[in-house]
Amino acid sequence: MAPENFTRVTEFILTGVSSCPELQIPLFLVFLVLYVLTMAGNLGIITLTSVDSRLQNPMYFFLRHLAIINLGNSTVIAPKMLMNFLVKKKTTSFYECATQLGGFLFFIVSEVMMLAVMAYDRYVAICNPLLYMVVVSRRLCLLLVSLTYLYGFSTAIVVSPCIFSVSYCSSNIINHFYCDIAPLLALSCSDTYIPETIVFISAATNLVFSMITVLVSYFNIVLSILRIRSPEGRKKAFSTCASHMIAVTVFYGTMLFMYLQPQTNHSLDTDKMASVFYTLVIPMLNPLIYSLRNNDVNVALKKFMENPCYSFKSM
């Protein structure tokens, strides 16, 4: 067989959210605000659930780790994206791109699994309240969180090298604001059947397992709520579940749209807009949806703002 005649790609150029020069500064300001709000909200949740004695049950333990994951997911993407708004040559090295994809996969898969863990936690809390602290013990909490991170890490070290094992030898322009799977595979000059198959199987397995756990948990939660005799209690419980389900639906809907479709059907410009939701918008909204409507968190936040030392003294 004749030897291949090509120049291997050593760096990529990111097109960003928009290629319009007039929009770079306005977009920089918009996404800077989103990132700052994401940082503030999630760091606030991490701080409150770490130092306040009222927020030391399993629900807030899992919420703290969701905030850590959201913070990591945004930080893997946002700083590079913000920098690229301000420079003309939006380049990223081959290894920097691989590292970013690996970090993104670690956090996004960990978030998928953490949502399933949190759904199970809420199921036990509502359906078996008397046994809640026995079933969801400290040991189980640590085990579930450890498995969540381990699964995210194992997915990242399998999928990311697989994506970068194909040949990139023609265009090096990634039609995206970060190194994502679909735009990278679109640049490959070799057969992408194996990495596409691995990505599809991995995404399908992760999402289906997590979604089944979430749906079964919330189905039983709804049945339990319907048995509540007090109209006010039922209304409050439904309102709380609706908030969580909105966040879960937006997240899973975006992920299904992104990854469970054939590569040939991808519209990369549409994918960029969808990616904004689960890399920046959802991590920004999660602290509000999951906790700021919660009375315990509101009380803890008020006490912390009045006297930051109060929470430490009350532990």
From Swiss-Prot:
The keyword Chloroplast does not apply. It is a multi-pass membrane protein. Residues 47-54, 121-139, 218-237, 293-315 are cytoplasmic. The chain crosses the membrane at residues 26-46, 55-75, 100-120, 140-160, 198-217, 238-258, 272-292. It holds the Pfam family 7tm_4. GO terms for cellular component: plasma membrane. PROSITE patterns: G_PROTEIN_RECEP_F1_1, G_PROTEIN_RECEP_F1_2. Gene3D superfamilies: Rhodopsin 7-helix transmembrane proteins. Glycans are attached at N5, N265. It is found in: Cell membrane. Residues 1-25, 76-99, 161-197, 259-271 are extracellular. InterPro entries: GPCR_Rhodpsn (IPR000276), GPCR_Rhodpsn_7TM (IPR017452), Olfact_rcpt (IPR000725). Disulfide bonds join C97-C189. Odorant receptor. Belongs to the G-protein coupled receptor 1 family. PANTHER family: OLFACTORY RECEPTOR (PTHR48018). This is Olfactory receptor 8J3. It comes from Homo sapiens (Human). The gene is OR8J3.
